[in-house]
C-alpha cells in the first residue's frame, strides 16, 4: 500500500478540511454499519473506541482512507494500555528494518524516510499508523473490518458500486464492492466478511495465501498484487479466488469467529523478549517501500500473532534482507526469500516462505536453481548456500510438536507420491540426447528434480521459465501446486502466456490458465494423499516443447528399482486396505451374530432365568411405587388443606373476618379431589394387597425350600456315602466269592434235574452290565497282568509273602505222576489268571511265571492209606476257552452248557474215592446231599462265569467247545454216581469220627501259595481237596455242625483257632473255604468233611 509520511506541522491545518473530514467520517460510519450488518460474529467497538476514532478524525488534516488492524477488542479489554506502549516501542524494536541496510541494527531508533520514490506521490490521502504513532494519535484499539470508509473518493478512484464474486475452496459468495479499493487488505477484508467462520485477517496476511483475479478475455487467473494498477481491475462482476499454497495451515471452522485456531505453518510470533514491543507484519520488511503500507499489528501482549498458544518466529523472517532487495523489484509485500531459522525443518522449507520474485506465469517447476534447492530441502538436504540464521531470542515451542509431526507425515506421503510419479515419468522416456535450446525461456530441468508429469508418448512437457527478475538462491517461484482453477478440465500443461514486459520494467501480472486449475480446491489437498500418484499430463497440441533426458544405465536401473518398490508399496497398501475393510466387515458381522445369539438366548431362557415371578414382582413393585406416590401426594394435599382450613377458621373466630367464598370453593375443590383420590386408592389397595401377599407367600415357600435344602442336604450326602460304603463291601465280598467259584467245581449232572445245568435267571437280567474283559490273561511264556485295579492293589500288598509261601509249598509237594499231564493240559487251555505251572515250579515251561493269584486244585486222594489211584486219560479233552464278555453275550439268551472239566491236582486229574480200586460199599447211601450241594455249586460256578467272564479270552472255536461240552456231560453223569457213593462214605465216617494223625497230615499237605497256615485255617470249615485231606486233624472242633440251608456265610470264621491267618488272606471275612447249600446260598462245611472229600478247594484270595 502506498504510504505518505507527513510532518508534524501538517496536523495543524485548516478547520474546513477538518470539518470535511468529519463529514466523510460520518458517512464512513454509516456505510461501515451497512458492511457490518451480517458480521454478527465479530466484536463491536466500544464507546471508548468510538471516542478515540472521533478524536483521531479531528486530529488529522487529511482524511485517513484505510488502514488494517486485527481483532483487538477482546485483547484491548484486557490490556487497554498496551497499544500505546506498543506504538511507542515501535521505533525501539529491532524489527524496524530497512531492506537496503547491510545488517540488522537494533540501535537504529530514528526512522529516516530514505528511498522515498515517486510511488509515494500517487495518492496524497493515505496515512499510515506509524505516522499516527509518531504524532501521538491513539485509535483506542478499535476492531476494524478493514473496509474503507465510504466517502467522496478521489476523482481518479471514483467508480460505481457493484458485485464481486469471492471463491474460497468449494464455496462461492457474492460481496458488495466498496467505493474504492485502496489496498489488497480491502480485498482480504471482503473475504473475511464473506467467510467469517473460515478466514481471518491474520491468516490472509500469511505468506501462504494468495488472491487471484480472473481475466475473462484471456481465460487466465492473475495473481492480484498490491498495486493500484491491479486493484483497479477489480470491477463489477469480477471473480476473485483465494488460494492456499499450504492447506494444512488453513484455519478450521471458527466457532463464532472469536476463538481463532492457530495455523499450522510457522507464524510470525514474537517471543518473550519482544512481546511487550510492537512490530510490523511481514509485508513491511519484505518490500522496498515502492508500494508499502506500514501498519501496526495490534496483537495482545500475551497473545501471539496468530491467536493461540505461543509459537516461535517463522524461519528467517527477520533475517538479512539484502539478498531479497538486490535485484530491485519486489512483486508483493508477502513475498521475500528468507533464510531458515535455528529450528529449521526441511519438510517445511518449500512451504514456509514465499519467493521474493514475481511469478508472471505459475509454473509447475520452480526454476533452475530453486528447484534443486527445494527438492533437496524436501528430502532433508540442507543447501550449502543457505546458512541458517538464528533470531536473537527464538525459543522452541513444544506445543507444536504434535502438529509438526502430523505435517511431517503428510509431507512424507507427498514425497512418496512425487517420487512415484518421478520414477514413472523417467522410465517412460526414450534416452536421447537433450535438445539444445537457445531460447532463454525454455526450461530444461534435470529429470531427477522434476515433478511427476509423464506424457503419453514419453516426452517431458516443460513450460516457459519465469523471467529472472533478480532471483537469488533463497528466492523461488510459486509452484504449480499452488494454483487454483474454476475449470472442469483435467489438469494439464498450461498454455504459455508470455510476458510482454522485460525484466527492467514493471513485471507482468502472474497468470494461471483457468483450465489448468483444480475446480474446488487447490492441488495441495490432492497432494496430501499419497495414493494414487499424480496423473500424467495430457498432451495438448500447441505451445509445447520437447526435451529428452539421457540417463545412465545405473540411474535407469535405480529408477526401475524405485518404480518397482513404489508399485509393491502401492499394492501392499491396497491389499492392507482391502484386508482392513474385510476384517472390519467380519468384525461387524461377528458382533452382530453374537448379539443376536445373546438376545435369542436371553429371550429363550427368560422364563427360566428371570422366571415368571420376576415379571410379577416387577409389576407389583411398579404398582406399589405408584400407589405410594399417590398416597404421599394425597397426604400432602390433605395437610395443606387442613392448615388452610384451620387458618381460615382461626381468622373467622379470632379476628371476626369475613369469609371469602372463592377461597372456600377452592378448598372444597381440593377436598373433593382428595376424596376421589382416597376412594380410588381404597379400590386399588385390595388388588395390590393380594398381589403382595401372593408374592410374599411365594417368597416364603422359596425360603422354606431353601432352608429345607440346607438342612436336609448334609444328611442326604451322609446317607449316600454310607450306601456307597455298604455297596463297596458287598462288591468286595461278591468278588471274593466269584474268585472261589471260578475254579470250575466238577458237579455231577443228573439227567432228571434241569436246574443243575440251567443258570439262574437273575444273571440273565438285561439290566446287568456286561463286565469288560479282564485286563490280562495267562500266556504260556509268563507275564501276567492284573485282572483289574482292585486285584492289582491287593496283589501289591502280598507279593513278597506269596513268593515265600510258594517256595515253602514246593518243599511239601509229594511226587505225582500225573502232574505232567494236568500241567500240560492247563497250560494249553489258558483259562484262569494263573497257570498250573505256578503251583509246580519244577515244570520248565512255567517256572518263571510270577505268582499273582493262588488257587487250589482238586486232588484225587482220599487218605494216606488209600490205594494208588489210576490216572484217567485226559488227552481227548480239548483246551477250555476263557470266558469273556463276548462269550457271555452269546450265551446269555440261551441255555448255558455245563462247565469244562476241572483242573486236577497232583494225584490224578479225576481221581476220586469211587475209582475201581476204591471200595464201593457206601455208594448207595450218598444219593442226596452231595448232589444237591454240588449241583448248586455248579450253578454258582456258572453264575460266576457270567460275572467274571470278562477276564478270559476265547481260545477255540465253537465246534471244539461243543465237543468239549458233550464229553464233559458224559463225565459229569459218571461223577454224579461217584459223588453219591463218596457222600455215603462221608456219612459213615462222620458217625465214627475217627481223628487223623497230625504227622500224616503235615506230611501230605500240598501248599500252594500262602498256605503255610492251612492247619490253622481248618477252623474256618474249609473243604480241602488234593493232598490237603488231613489238614483238619488238629484244628478246631470236628463236630462243628453244618447246615446247608443256612443261606449265609457262617459267622464263626476265624474263631476256631483264634483267628490266625496269613496276610495274604482276605481277613476275617475271607471265604477261603465255602460250600453251596441246597438253596444256592453260601455256607461253611463242617471240618470232618475235609478228611474224605476230594473236590473241595482251598483258595487264597488276594
From Swiss-Prot:
Keywords carried by this UniProt record: Coiled coil
Gene3D superfamilies from the UniProt entry: Actin interacting protein 3, C-terminal domain
InterPro entries: AIP3-like_C, SRCIN1
Coiled-coil spans in chain: 405-430, 554-579, 614-654
Chain intervals with Pro residues compositional bias: 867-881
Region Disordered, annotated ranges: 1-69, 295-318, 450-475, 489-539, 745-774, 832-958, 1031-1087
Ranges of Polar residues composition bias in the record: 832-849, 936-958
Pfam family, one: AIP3
Superkingdom per UniProt: Eukaryota
Biased composition (Basic and acidic residues): 1-11, 50-65
Low complexity bias (residue ranges): 12-21, 904-918
GO cellular component terms, semicolon-separated: cytoplasm
Protein name in the entry: Coiled-coil domain-containing protein AGAP005037
Organism, scientific name: Anopheles gambiae
